[in-house]
Amino acid sequence: MTSSLAGQLFRMRNIDRVITSERSQKIRASFLFDGRQAADIDMQTIFDIGCDGLGELRKMNRKFDSFASTLFSPAIKDLDRVLQTREENERLDESIRSFLFLMAPYFLTKPAGKALEWLVRRFRIQEFNARDLLAAILPYHETKAFLTMLTIITFETRDMELFGFLVTQRKARRLLDRGTLMAQCVRDRALMTFVCSSVFRACQMGFEYAGLHAFYAMIFSQYITSLASVGGADVQFVLPFVLDGLQLDGDAQIAAYMVLGTLATRVTLSADALDKTLCAVAQRRADLRAMTMCVVQLVQTQEAALT
């Protein structure tokens, strides 16, 4: 009964989206073209553009191969997702999520733009997958490409409290500079949680890259330094993200060392928190030199907790 009711609610919720889907055939959202140009380009042409982009991405990374038989398959070319069941859309969302995080390192390249154009036109990722799309491209928030994508993203009402500030940026056609993003993260911990969770999800999915590690280290360290003071509640919020970062591999773990070092200069941890942190540092080490430097910094800054 519950499952049946959920299915009915899902179909009712999509009635407006079916209408919107029909209307969008006249008003085209586009990543590569302006609205007037996009309206004159048919679905087959956009599909060809997308497949061309995917082909170039496959040369850069063979992990893109699998999408030739899914998101970029001729068999799915005429699919309208608003007419699909909840289960079918969930499978589609999972595939789109994987593609977006895999695509992230190549976001500023022409092939990625071509592939995204197809996903925007056919699957309306700017509407149905807005959170995953933002999560994947947020490290590029200071670029024109990010702003271009932001101009076509549709935020659901439930997400406006979290992403409403982006609407202001979009209306003003302003790049999202680091200071603005950081100020919003300090005002709203939910946004900082979204940022950090997005980074960890990409790493756990195996889609990490150097720019992502740098983004995590920089934005989290700056978040800590931007706090007027670091109290117990702040430590309780920040430390779990640091400990999660220490469980990652390679450069992601080194980035976590940097964040931990910043935290250690701002606050004296409790004996229990310091013990958990040192255990986490010692448990997995991606780089012995980086780990040693981290431990030395902890000893120097946390002397009171060690005595």
Mark where each language-model region is.
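Extended alpha-solenoid scaffolds built from HEAT/ARM-like alpha-helical repeats
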Residues: 1-307
